[in-house]
């Protein structure tokens, strides 16, 4: 759901084109800068602040002073209902927070990221703006990927021999850790695919190859599984939105592949075929890390389950890491503090209570609904779905599906690049239906 919080104070007043051009150029420059800086989070400042946060502070203040308060245009605020539910649940849970400072920091991050999201949605006016940001995203992702590969080569003396190994360097490039980098690259691959009808094939293939190698270098099992989920969703979406006469052959091919996969699975379970291959993968590639990672997360989640039983309304935002563990249960050799939840769903349920998890699920449902709005509007306004609309629809669904899966084992709701993407998604729905920031429309 999105609402119009304000209306133009003088709806009949025409703004001269000469006056709007500098503002449009400034808005586009800011959008590009935000895209370039979104994955640049190191070095880290106080409270995990980054360079982008300083830029955004001035941008949010300027947007409020020169756009919102003068009432020059309608302010579009998508996703307001689920975010209000999250906020109410978070405030209630603060009553049981072991650390109010951590709760206050988490709430401040919520407010800041949503304010930035609103600014982005209201600055994205046209399809050209959306394309500009996506192109900037892809080039930024290529640079980030090259940074990750440079870290790997520097640490290994120029060798790629440990790229698929179970041990070795896991580069983070300009992000906090390899798992965060994997999440960013997973999203970036599908953003790049959305431009397949708008940029040349060779640069696209090169950028996809660089990002793919960097994604492998992270050795992130969660990132790989999320990418697989997104890739499957992308294929299904492209088939479902494509020409009807091609669906039969594609469906037959898919059934053949599924049948072969089922036969191989039966042979493996019945006669043990493939056991050596799986054992080799577990011993010599990063797939073998999956068991260790799962055990570590299960210990964390067991402790959070105990905390939830004590405080069913929540333990306060950001307070998963403030719990004190016993000697036998401690998760760090040098500390009695617990670790973060490593799951958005568990974090919202345990830290923010029932309203928090309902708000999170509502947020995800609203995002999928926004994609449906975009697709229906694109088909209606274009007299049929153009290829670029199919590609962007498939990319949005793929990123959402990958994020839904990745959120099982990572907390990504405070990732700046994630909020940048959902701003693109919501702006796409508004633009496709003709409801941009300058249009005085009702709640939608």
Outline where the language-model segments fall.
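Loop-to-helix entry and N-terminal half of a specific, functionally important transmembrane alpha helix
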Residues: 30-36, 141, 339, 343, ...
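A membrane-periplasm/extracellular boundary helix in multi-pass inner-membrane enzymes
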Residues: 146, 152-155, 217, 238-289, ...
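Membrane-interface catalytic loops of GT-C/OST-like multi-pass glycosylation enzymes that act
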Residues: 46-49, 101-105, 175-178, 219-223, ...
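Transmembrane signal-anchor hairpin modules in multi-pass inner-membrane enzymes, especially those
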Residues: 1-105, 125-135, 198-202, 245-252, ...
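Alpha-helical transmembrane segments of multi-pass inner-membrane proteins
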Residues: 91-92, 115, 131-167, 173-241, ...
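Long extracytoplasmic/lumenal interhelical loops at the membrane interface
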Residues: 160, 171, 287-302, 306-352, ...
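Transmembrane alpha-helices of multi-pass inner-membrane enzymes
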Residues: 58-63, 231, 363-366, 370, ...
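Membrane-embedded alpha-helical segments of multi-pass membrane proteins
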Residues: 50-66, 107-116, 180-189, 228-232, ...
């Amino acid at each position: 759901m999105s609402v119009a919080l304000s209306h133009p104070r003088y709806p009949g007043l025409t703004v001269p084109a000469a006056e709007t051009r500098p503002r449009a150029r400034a808005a586009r420059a800011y959008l590009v800068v935000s895209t370039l800086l979104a994955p640049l989070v190191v070095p880290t400042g106080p409270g995990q602040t980054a360079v982008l946060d300083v830029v955004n502070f001035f941008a949010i203040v300027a947007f409020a002073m020169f756009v919102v308060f003068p009432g020059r245009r309608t302010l579009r605020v998508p996703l307001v209902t689920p975010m209000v539910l999250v906020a109410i649940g978070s405030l209630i849970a603060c009553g049981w927070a072991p650390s109010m400072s951590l709760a206050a920091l988490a709430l401040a991050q919520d407010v800041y990221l949503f304010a930035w999201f609103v600014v982005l949605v209201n600055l994205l006016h046209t399809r050209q703006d959306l394309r500009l940001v996506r192109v900037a995203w892809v080039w930024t992702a290529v640079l980030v990927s090259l940074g990750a590969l440079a870290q790997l080569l520097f640490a290994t003396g120029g060798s790629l021999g440990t790229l698929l190994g179970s041990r070795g360097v896991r580069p983070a490039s300009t992000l906090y850790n390899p798992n965060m980098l994997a999440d960013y690259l997973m999203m970036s691959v599908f953003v790049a695919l959305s431009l397949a009808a708008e940029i040349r094939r060779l640069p696209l293939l090169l950028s996809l190859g660089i990002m793919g190698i960097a994604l492998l270098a992270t050795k992130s099992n969660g990132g790989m599984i999320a990418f697989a989920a997104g890739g499957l969703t992308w294929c299904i979406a492209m088939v479902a939105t494509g020409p009807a006469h091609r669906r039969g052959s594609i469906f037959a091919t898919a059934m053949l592949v599924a049948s072969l996969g089922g036969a191989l699975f039966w042979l493996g379970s019945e006669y043990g075929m493939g056991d050596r291959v799986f054992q080799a993968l577990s011993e010599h590639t990063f797939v073998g890390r999956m068991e260790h990672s799962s055990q570590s997360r299960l210990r964390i989640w067991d402790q959070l389950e105990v905390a939830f039983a004590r405080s069913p309304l929540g333990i306060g935002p950001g307070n998963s890491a403030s719990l004190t563990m016993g000697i036998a249960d401690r998760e760090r050799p040098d500390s009695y503090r617990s670790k973060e939840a490593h799951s958005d769903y568990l974090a919202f349920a345990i830290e923010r209570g029932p309203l928090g998890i309902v708000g999170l699920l509502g947020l995800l449902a609203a995002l999928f609904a926004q994609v449906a709005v975009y697709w229906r509007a694109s088909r209606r306004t274009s007299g049929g779905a153009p290829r670029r609309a199919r590609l962007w629809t498939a990319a949005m669904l793929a990123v959402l599906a990958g994020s839904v899966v990745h959120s099982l084992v990572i907390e990504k709701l405070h990732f700046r690049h994630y909020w940048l993407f959902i701003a693109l998604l919501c702006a796409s729905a508004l633009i496709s239906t003709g409801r941009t920031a300058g249009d005085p429309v009702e709640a939608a």
